[in-house]
Amino acid sequence: MDAQRFVLPMNGENISVVIGEDITGHISEEVGHYDSLVFMISRNVEEMFGSKIPPLENYGSSTIKITLNDGESLKTLRNYQRIIKVLVEKKVSRNSLLVYVGGGTVGDLAGFVAATYKRGLRMIAVPTTLLAQVDSSIGGKNGLDFSDVKNVIGTFYNPYLIIDDLQFLKSTPDLIREGMGEVIKYSIIAGGDMFRKVSECSLSNFHDHSADIVKMSIKIKADIVNRDYYDRNGVRSILNLGHTIAHGIEGASKGQISHGRAVATGLMVEAHIGEKYGNTRPEVIDEIMKLADNYGIERVRISDIGVNSILRYISNDKKMSEGYINMPVPADIGNIITMKVTERMISDGLNTFIREHERK
C-alpha cells in the first residue's frame, strides 16, 4: 500500500499527515533538525510492535525515552511533573522534538508536555489506535484530569506531523470496534460519500478500506474544528453527537463500557429522542443500528446500568444549564440539528431504547 500524504490546515497552521503501513520510519527523517528527541511511547505498543518501530539508536545519542502506561490514570499532574523533571534534568532545549507513539491518553499527556515545556516543543504524533487516529490526534485539544474531573487542565496545541500507521490497527478487532463508534458518528454528520463508504464496508473487510476511512474521518473533523477551533461559538459541539448519552453510560458503568459501544448506543438513543419529538426521520435509527451491527459493535444494555444512574451522570454534564442541555441530534443522515433536551426527554429516550431493543 502506497502511503497517502496530504496537508491539513488547522487554525492557521499546516499539519502534514501521512497514512499507510510500516511508515514509522518517517520519524527518522525529522530528527536531524533538532538538538534532541523526547520519545514518549505506550508500554503496550512497545511490547506488541517494538520490532516495527525504528531503534532509538537511529535517532542519535541525544534521545530521552519515556515509557508510559496507557489509561486515564496516566493523565495526572504528578505524571506531568515527573516528565518535566526529566526534561529539565536532561537540559532539553526548546529546539527539541517530542514524538509520541500511543493511544489517546498518551497523546493527551504528550500534547500537554509539548505545549507547556519552555512554551512549546515541536511535536510529531504517531497515534496507534483507530480512535486516536480519527479523533483525539485531530483538533489540538489535550488535557489532564484533576480532582476526578476529566480534562479540566489543558491546552490547544497541534503536532506539525501526524503519522497514521495502519499496521497498529491489525492487532485485534477490538481496536476497530472501539474507533468505529466515532467513524459512524462522522458518517452521520457528513452523509454523502462518507456514509456510503462506511455503509459499504464492514469489520471483515475494514483493512481493505482503512486508509480511506481514516483520511475521510480526519478531514470531516478538521473541517468542523476549523470553524470553531477554540470551542466557543457552538459549531464544534456537533462533534458531541452521540456523546451526551455515551458519557452518561461510561460514567454510570464506571468505565466498564468501551467508548465505541457507548458512542454507538448514544447515537441510537439520541436518534430516538429526535424521532419522538418530530425532528428525526424514523428510518435513521435503523440505519445507525445497521452500521453498528456491520462492525460488530454490541449495543449497551441500558437496563443493566440503570436509567437513573445514567441520568445522574448526565445531570452533572458541564453543558447542562437551567435544566436542559443543547444536544445535537440527526434530523437525517448528513443533517444535524441542535435540540434543547431536558432530563425527562433523555429518560424517555433511554426507556424507549430499552423497550425497542432490549425486550424483543
Swiss-Prot record:
User: Where does the chain bind Zn(2+)?
Assistant: 182, 243, 259
Q: Which GO terms describe its cellular component?
A: cytoplasm
At the top level, the lineage of the source is: Archaea
* Single GO MF annotation: metal ion binding
Q: Which reaction does it catalyse?
A: 7-phospho-2-dehydro-3-deoxy-D-arabino-heptonate = 3-dehydroquinate + phosphate
Q: Which cofactor does it need?
A: NAD(+); Co(2+); Zn(2+)
Pathway per the UniProt entry? Metabolic intermediate biosynthesis; chorismate biosynthesis; chorismate from D-erythrose 4-phosphate and phosphoenolpyruvate: step 2/7
If you read the UniProt record, what top EC class would you report for this enzyme, in one word?
Answer: lyase
Residues that hold NAD(+) according to the record: 70-75, 104-108, 128-129, 141, 150
- The enzyme's E.C. designation: 4.2.3.4
Listed under GO biological process in this entry are: amino acid biosynthetic process; aromatic amino acid family biosynthetic process; chorismate biosynthetic process
Keyword annotations: Amino-acid biosynthesis, Aromatic amino acid biosynthesis, Cobalt, Cytoplasm, Lyase, Metal-binding, NAD, Nucleotide-binding, Zinc
Q: Where in the cell is it found?
A: Cytoplasm
Q: Quote the cofactor binding remark.
A: Binds 1 divalent metal cation per subunit. Can use either Co(2+) or Zn(2+).
Q: Which SUPFAM superfamilies match?
A: Dehydroquinate synthase-like (SSF56796)
Q: What does this protein do?
A: Catalyzes the conversion of 3-deoxy-D-arabino-heptulosonate 7-phosphate (DAHP) to dehydroquinate (DHQ).
Q: Which NCBIfam families match?
A: aroB
Which family does the entry's similarity section mention?
Answer: Belongs to the sugar phosphate cyclases superfamily. Dehydroquinate synthase family.
In Swiss-Prot or TrEMBL terms, this protein is called 3-dehydroquinate synthase
Which gene is transcribed and translated to give this protein?
A: aroB
